[in-house]
Amino acid sequence: MSTPFYVSPEQLMRDRADFARKGIAKGRSAIALQYADGILFVAENRSPALHKVAEIYDRMAFAAVGRYNEFENLRIAGVRLADMRGYSYDRRDVTGRALANAYAQTLGAIFSSGGEKPLEVEILVAEVGTTAADDQIYRLTYDGSIADVRGYAVMGGPAEQVADYVGEHYQEGISLAGALRLAVDALGHDSSEVRQLEPDQIEVAVLDRTRTQVRKFKRISDQTLARILSESRPDTAPSPESSAHTEETETVDGGSYESAAGTSAADDAPIAPPEDPDDNRPL
């Protein structure tokens, strides 16, 4: 009789963790940034149909990296949980903390189970408050670990390099234009060669506390994104007069751009699920 093959629990968990990390690293990075009026999400995403950032409930949003079919199932489950709780009790009872705890239990149970592979995903759950101090951002990893982060969070791809760049330049209370420029520049500094990302290569959305609608989530269109980036891009060859007023010309806080507090009916239209939910390409 042959001796059964044995793998220690420690080795099994290490192998599962390595498997999940490698899958997540194949995707592209996503960033969540707190700015003066809410929370900004910026993700490198070249697909116009497959969203990495989505609305969950009135004041809550979801961002993810990794295998699309896996985190899309988590997003749908989160929307259903939030809707059920809001309908059964009160809309104020739907909180980001409760949703993050539910996701943590699901991810942890799948990771510790030997019968199925771990999910190759990392997700962010964000809830915008009435003030910046009330904003909440929760980061959840493949093994169900949950962290309450402040200021900014980066996940997917070369997350450490992108996070280092954000950490060097991030300032509390930054404007929307400044936060967007910082996030786009950070995504371009994910390797030794600096890349210039175009509006059609990134996905941008905000949770804007200044919106009059109950739903605070809004996507930023490519046209608005291009305008904000052009206004916030520093001039590489300033004239003598403009160089004498560098601080004034580089200030974009008061720049004219489309407000995130849109009022059109299209802004509040629910995001339809993609046509091919079985697409397993890493995003």
UniProtKB/Swiss-Prot annotation:
Q: Does the keyword Metal-binding apply?
A: no
How does its record describe regulation of its activity?
The formation of the proteasomal ATPase ARC-20S proteasome complex, likely via the docking of the C-termini of ARC into the intersubunit pockets in the alpha-rings, may trigger opening of the gate for substrate entry. Interconversion between the open-gate and close-gate conformations leads to a dynamic regulation of the 20S proteasome proteolysis activity.
- According to the record, the residues making up region (Disordered) are 228-283
User: What pathway is this protein said to act in by its record?
Assistant: Protein degradation; proteasomal Pup-dependent pathway
Where is this chain's protein located in or outside the cell?
Cytoplasm
Q: What does this protein do?
A: Component of the proteasome core, a large protease complex with broad specificity involved in protein degradation.
Q: How does it assemble?
A: The 20S proteasome core is composed of 14 alpha and 14 beta subunits that assemble into four stacked heptameric rings, resulting in a barrel-shaped structure. The two inner rings, each composed of seven catalytic beta subunits, are sandwiched by two outer rings, each composed of seven alpha subunits. The catalytic chamber with the active sites is on the inside of the barrel. Has a gated structure, the ends of the cylinder being occluded by the N-termini of the alpha-subunits. Is capped by the proteasome-associated ATPase, ARC.
Family to which this protein belongs: Belongs to the peptidase T1A family.
Question: What protein name applies here?
Answer: Proteasome subunit alpha
Organism whose genome encodes this protein: Kribbella flavida (strain DSM 17836 / JCM 10339 / NBRC 14399)
